[in-house]
């Protein structure tokens, strides 16, 4: 279990940021293959210190190394991300570092500092934990869709945690597992209420079904 990140002023938390074209939800499972030296160093530091890091969606720019001051360094991030805890790791034969991270709490970026190698360090503020919420009959279709997704062999390998009785858990896992564009997933992540997220998911699932 990871220890608590270092707390700064006004309850802000300091953590390294991993910008990706992927959205991580609380409780979600994220396998990663790490090859860039800056992120290899970051992950090894996190494992050594039992620290967490932040996953934030790239609004624009590249995941690939663009050091500060380099031409084309136009990286821009969304402000809301998710704290990630490393729950497994391995060293592949090709030298790549493989990890499995699990989403914990949502946060908002207050400020960032970019190192010379392009690694982002951020001061973040945790967002209030969402209410668990209750499911109703109108959510029955969404629960069925989620159950079907959980039977997929690739998803079973990830073994995501889900409580099919909780609105928050169902909304997070559906948003996580449905094949949606990253920006749509980001909009779902930024919602503060499970019922609001479930309502939007009902609309999206309805579009899938024509």
Predicted feature locations:
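A short structural micro-motif
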Residues: 194-195, 207
